Amino acid sequence: MMGIFLGIVAGLAVLFLLWLAAMGTRRGERQMALFRQYRYAHRGLHNIERGVPENSILAFRYAITGGFGAELDVHLTKDKRLVVAHDSFLDRLCGVHVRIEEQTLEELRKLTLQGTKETIPLLEEVLPLFCGKTPLIIELKVENGNYKELCEQTCKLLGTYRGDFCIESFDPRVLRWLKKNEPFILRGQLAENYTKSGAAPGFPFLARLAMTMLLPNFLTRPDFIAFRYEDRNILPVRLCCGLLKGQEASWTIRHQSELEVAEQAGSLVIFEGFLPKKRAEQPAASEQSQQGAA
């Protein structure tokens, strides 16, 4: 009996070590150090109550004025243009039931954001705003399996960009593509606790479990893990970003107290809905930038 017990323990130990090996990150310490110097306004420094919609040129300008980087979302249109918007269907943002991937840029240009005069920007219009100023976290939004085209078009555009940026996605295929084709681009795996009720509907439980346990890292070797703040204390995150010293990013931070907890743990912070208190190495936000915050 003792032999069986020891065999089980040894087997579990081996599985645990294999899991640790699988979830490791690339550890680009020097490159990630730059990104840790900034905080990142989620979809820009937006505040619709003050006429500043999310993922708009105006929201990005306010973020830069405040000394913040920004996280933004990129979709590929029907005519292969890269536009900055979070939702694929535009009911919430523009009040019309159309899908970005089924529209041309000309068709999208006729729409306005959240009742304002702001329109959906192209990624190529946003990049010059940040170049030489603050970094960008660019999330690629895969729809209907278009990850390859989305990656190709994005990297083609970024190939001439001289600002600081990294790419993240919920879809591991994006990171796998980057690892194979653009290994020098910093890449991050977006994730959350998919085993919770309501998370990632439509995906089999085993697939959701594998994503929660960060198993795709074995194939993608991300530079950082961007995990939902509320889920950051689950075992896979603490092992990957604590024991293995992987870089963590926390989304979406909505209170100063959450920001302080995340930064104390060494996490990048993606915030929304408030203006963070300044820290010693970051200049105070100007009066203009405060107009874009809650």
Please provide the spans of the model-predicted regions:
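Phosphate-group recognition and catalysis centered on beta-loop-alpha active-site segments
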Residues: 2-294
